[in-house]
UniProtKB/Swiss-Prot annotation:
Belongs to the 'phage' integrase family. XerD-like subfamily. InterPro entries: CB, DNA_brk_join_enz, Integrase-like_cat_sf, Integrase_catalytic, Integrase_recombinase_N, Integrase_SAM-like_N, Tyrosine_recombinase_XerD-like. GO terms for molecular function: DNA binding; tyrosine-based site-specific recombinase activity. It comes from the Bacteria. This is Tyrosine recombinase XerD-like. Putative tyrosine recombinase. Not involved in the cutting and rejoining of the recombining DNA molecules on dif(SL) site. Residues 1-72 form the Core-binding (CB) domain. Residues 91-247 form the Tyr recombinase domain. GO terms for biological process: DNA transposition.
Length: 247
């Protein structure tokens, strides 16, 4: 299994210090699971991190989950393993007026899936649950449209040239935009991918919820009415949006 660590690290374009940190965390991970992957071993590894600070634990989760995804991608494992415990940092609620440096979201990244997830939330206000069910047949690259069917509501959204570029370049599945052997990835996978990207660009205090809040505030600032935004988000009622329009 050690050789797979080196192959994984060789596939990354990261600084020497980050490389050393990845290598240390992964060697420690293999030692603690006795070089044998199983759900039970992963649970034991997660418990071994309980004494660490939230930020240190979050870093190790990200590193190990990237490695586990790599093992699955190169067919070392016959199923997708992941650390499933959610790591929460101390609450640092981002105010509605938080100014994002948008350029960071569009720069080249080591986490293209996480980047696309972030952009689809920030630009279109989509939920991770909606992204997980998004089928390729619902994406029209020629007209730059995405159809989102939530069962009770259907919305058709136009997307930017930047998202078109990412969609065109991204390796996608055969059925879903984000796919694991023909099936949607888990919610934890979306959390991990988004978190890894946000950590990379220096916005690890953000979340899917705060990115969606930024979308809502930007729509309001563009002059989108409360009812128009309610429809755009596919909500049955504007109640949850009213607080943003009181700002």
């Amino acid at each position: 299994m050690i050789k797979h660590i080196e192959a994984f690290l060789a596939s990354k374009t990261i600084s020497e210090n980050t490389l050393k940190s990845y290598r240390y965390d992964l060697n420690q991970f293999l030692m603690l699971i006795d070089h044998k992957l199983s759900d039970e071993k992963l649970v034991l590894y997660q418990k071994s991190l309980n004494h660490l600070s939230a930020s240190a634990k979050k870093r190790k989760f990200s590193t190990v989950n990237q490695f586990l995804h790599y093992l699955y991608k190169v067919n070392v494992t016959d199923r997708f393993f992941e650390l499933s415990g959610k790591v929460s940092l101390p609450s640092t609620k981002v105010p509605f007026t938080y100014q994002l440096d948008d350029k960071r979201f569009y720069q080249k990244t080591q986490h293209p899936s996480g980047q696309l997830i972030a952009l689809l939330i920030l630009e279109l206000g989509l939920l991770p649950s909606e992204l997980s069910k998004l089928r390729l047949s619902e994406i029209d690259l020629d007209f730059q449209l995405i159809r989102v069917d939530n069962g009770s509501t259907v919305k058709v959204l136009s997307f930017s040239q930047a998202i078109l570029k990412h969609l065109s370049e991204m390796e996608v599945g055969s059925t879903y935009l984000f796919e694991n052997k023909g099936k949607p990835y888990s919610r934890q996978w979306f959390f991990n991918q988004l978190n890894a990207f946000l950590l990379e660009i220096g916005y690890d205090q953000l979340s899917a919820q705060s990115l969606r809040e930024q979308f809502i505030i930007r729509e309001k600032e563009k002059g989108t009415s409360l009812m128009e935004l309610t429809q755009k988000l596919g909500l049955k009622s504007p109640i949850t949006l009213e607080k943003y329009y009181r700002l």
